[in-house]
Amino acid sequence: LLPALAKAKAKAQRINCVNNLKQLGISFRIFATDNQDRFPMAVTTNEGGVADVIADARGLGDPTMMYMIFGALSNELSTPKTVVCPSDSLRTTPKNFYELVTLRDRSGGKNAAISYFVNFTADETMPQVILAGDRNLTNSQFNPGNETAYSKMVKLDPRLLDRGRGADLGFTSSMHQNSGNVVLSDGSVQQVSGQRVREQIVNSGQEHQLLFPYYRRNMN
């Protein structure tokens, strides 16, 4: 009975995660409708986005502030619960979006309130590009299970992936049993393996610059 209950719980959590990502996809697209077909990552802070905060035209910026993307979507998202996967035991849900962007990580705000990576280069005009997904995507270069550093931007080149690079791309077992969920720029959600993520990036033909919500849990 207990294994059956655990399996049913995991299935329900995954469905909830899919619904979260569907809502995220809708929110990004509503934002784009109001901002000349641009997602928050391509809109400056003066216009209500985060482009110059995370990476400006000179290549400067602070990828550790990726949580600001969801702050920019606060008008489109009904609750900060949407950005926390129910299977993610290492993330907490703040009471509101003000707490999300103002509380310290160790107090449950900022990246500690985010379960999903975001593709900084995603655009509504590229429907097959991955927009966001479960943060436990990993390979030999980035590992969400060992958060000893702050957030970073991970670049995945479709040409290199097509030549065999990234064969170790996959999801850890911490959230959805070595698989994950992603939402594309067209708003569709897919349940995927690491291999399927690699194929999606290759087929899109676009470099993906993934921002992960890391924070240093080991800090005193």
Please report, for each region that a protein language model flagged, where it lies by residue.
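Amphipathic alpha-helical segments typified by the pilin-like N-terminal helix
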Residues: 1-19
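Short, well-structured segments within or immediately adjacent to enzyme catalytic domains
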Residues: 15-220
